[in-house]
Amino acid sequence: MALASTAVNTDVTPPVQTFDLIMVGGGLVTCSSLSRQNCVPGSQFTADAKQTSVYRLTHSALERAFKHPSLSGLTAPQKTILLHASQQQGDAGSSLSYQAFYDAISAVEKDFLTDLNDQVYYALLDLLEDEQAITSGINRQEHVMLSATQNQYGAQIFSLFTQQALFKKQQRQPQAKRPLIAVVTASARDPFESIDFYTQVFEQAGADVIWLPLDSALQAAIAQQQCDQLPALREKIQGNVDRARLYPVATALQQSMCVSPDSLYQQLLNIDGLFLNGGDQRLTLSAWLTPQKKPSKALDIIKKRLQQHQIVIGGTSAGTAVMTAQYMVTGGTSHGALTYGVLAAEAPSERCEESHCQSDIPATAVTYSTAGGLGFFPFGVTDTHFSQRERQVRLFMLSALSENKLGFGVDENTALLVDLRNHTVSVVGEHGVWVVEQSHVTQTPLSYSGVMHYLTAGDNAKVDVVTQSLNHIQLLSADKTINKQADVKREFNAWVDKACVDGQNDIDLGQAKLIIKPQSQQECDQIKRNGQHYQNINIQLNLVNH
């Protein structure tokens, strides 16, 4: 299945640099009909483009939803609240944005939606989402205009991935002009929602594109020979319901591939690039593992092709986090790491920070899986949305617990390129990649220490797998600086700047004391010359009352 785009750039030139992985930190800014704020002024989409998700808060829509087994837990008073909200909306209730939908229900009962558990909350949204039909069987789709994106870093990363996929293909077919890229959207609770986005992005970047309907539900259905139970498995494992109503073609394709999984395996043997979307890395992982947590046949195929350098694998956000062979972070914040520690436990629902959910694990506590991820990236722990969400402390503390003591935190709209054959890494994109190495922890008193680097576009290094550190670090000319837009929280970098000026910077974090100390002033020269990248700066975190 490929959803075609009319604007396709066929001028794809293989790059000089070769790599096997492109690990994106999330936040790839792209112009689309759902993200018009990312488009150059004057960009126009056709009338059939999907502009937002729409919900029906009407009596008939609610009565239909109440009949679905997933809402059997709703009480009579809860149903009355929803029906009353629909009456208040009148005709307007037939087409509501999510915010209008939320406000309409909250006007009747303030905490109604936040008090619902995940299963009921998401089922309610899915059952009331409108198809936005254009004609019978054809619904509105998100439209992408890659070339109309104001901030071109994301478009360049998509194009770079496409170029590398073509390079891989030309090793087998020298005259090839277009690579075949497969998109797997298993990270999302609703894996059908972003199909249009990713297929159009890579088509416009110059590739032939297929969507592979591989997700946790499909993996379970194949393993258990329960293809007739796919909708129920989607609800149980992924947490989505009623998807065939909105995505009839995609759900039919998934059903067909479940019955004939050899077609999935053949496509995995044919593709030149594989891209994993963002969302929840636990969902991505379970899409590639059997219900017994063993590598699936699909994963075995991809790993073998990766080892033979026949394919390039990319991912964004969760798609990057899941690539690690080390501990896989699953949730939490730096503040949560300082307050509650780093826990080998199941992460609570992402709604816990804003809703009244019950969980033994605090909403902000850092959680991780000791089993690791898919194992594509062997060099360390991975983290994403890095500087934007100030995740330095959480990655530092988790890396100290991992086997190889290396951590890589990738900023948004930025990517880490990984050459597995030569053990080299390099950075492209708008911001940078924070690396912590030689990290370790002492228990009495509780203290973490390590060495950190911050690499930006054009910087590269070699990973020494014996010493578990970076060497041969090459920083691009200090004339270039990274983007300092307001959306990036630069407090940590400001602390490093001060350490470079004063020789050391002690920061009181409340629950801990952070000490940043350059190994020599030479390590700060790049910062002093108006750069933002740096290398070989010692970092120590002393926790109080632990």
Where are these regions (language model features)?
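Short connector loops at secondary-structure junctions
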Residues: 187-190, 207-231
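C-terminal and late-domain segments of enzyme folds
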Residues: 5-179, 184, 189-197, 202-206, ...
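A structured beta-alpha segment of the ubiquitous adenosine-cofactor-binding alpha/beta core
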Residues: 220-222, 235-267
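A Trp-anchored, charged/polar loop motif used as the substrate-binding/catalytic surface
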Residues: 249-263, 297-300, 357-364
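Short acidic, glycine-rich surface-loop motifs adjacent to enzyme active sites
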Residues: 268-289
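Catalytic-core regions built around general acid/base machinery
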Residues: 263, 267, 294-309
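Low-complexity, highly charged intrinsically disordered N-terminal segments
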Residues: 183, 196-199, 207-210, 247, ...
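Catalytic nucleophile loop
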Residues: 275-278, 301-302, 306-327
